[in-house]
Regions:
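Conserved lysine of the Walker
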Residues: 78
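Conserved substrate/cofactor phosphate-moiety recognition/catalytic segment
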Residues: 87-129
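Glycine-rich phosphate-binding loop used to anchor ATP phosphates in small-molecule kinases
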Residues: 120-170, 186
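The conserved Walker
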Residues: 74
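A glycine- and Lys/Arg-enriched "phosphate-lid" helix/loop adjacent to the NTP-binding pocket
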Residues: 155-207
Length: 208
């Protein structure tokens, strides 16, 4: 029963539809019994949904993926770990969009507060796309919480949109790994030095 209504029709692509509909006292509706429209059964999809993801609604498929995020200060190994794990598990990984954005739009090595919001939004869009390409796991380098921490570190405030995205990120990931700053510092031109790395790492740890 659905509310005050009974079951009126039973839809399937299987011969057992006749027996089920009789048991339910409803009309049997056979759909695509020869599987010309969808040449696959639900039981086959269930055995390996990642192999047959083209038959699964994107909203459903995203929930089948374990999204694992790596956070930490710059030069803590997030990118290396995410990429290597993706290769090991034959899946994709989500690079830190902020790095790409910074290299393209920074002025005197700085970004404005609204640009940090754009980074968080752009990262999320790309991450959702990667979820649909992933095989069982998605390994994600950085999230909106870290972008929020950058905003607070450089500007002492974050736009409302970034605050909202950071809050949503608290419950978005299945696993969160904090990478440590106990490895040698890679002093590239886009970073703020080893001393700042340690300071920023303590802020991230405190926030967690």
């Amino acid at each position: 029963m659905v509310g005050n209504r009974g079951i009126t029709h039973f839809y399937s692509s299987e011969p057992y539809g006749e027996h089920v509909s009789q048991a339910l006292h409803c009309i049997n509706r056979i759909v695509d019994i020869n599987r010309t429209t969808f040449p696959i059964s639900a039981s086959t999809i269930q055995k390996n949904p990642y192999l047959y993801k083209e038959y699964i609604n994107p909203v459903v498929y995203r929930d089948l993926i374990t999204n694992i995020v790596f956070v930490g200060a710059p030069s803590t190994g997030k990118t290396t770990i995410a990429e290597r794990l993706a290769n090991k598990f034959n899946t994709v990984w989500m690079p830190e969009y902020g790095r790409e954005y910074w290299e393209k739009y920074q002025v005197n090595r700085r970004l404005e507060p609204w640009q940090l919001s754009e980074i968080a939004e752009g990262h999320l869009i790309r991450e959702n796309e990667k979820l649909l390409q992933a095989n069982k796991y998605l390994f994600t380098d950085t999230n909106a919480i870290t972008t929020y921490m950058f905003a607070m570190d450089y500007h002492s405030f974050a736009e409302d949109k970034l605050v909202e995205l950071a809050k949503a990120a608290e419950n978005r990931y299945d696993l969160v790994f904090l990478c440590s700053d106990d490895i040698p510092y890679d002093d590239t031109w886009d970073r703020s030095g080893d001393v700042h790395r340690h300071i920023f790492q303590r802020k991230i740890e405190s926030d967690l």
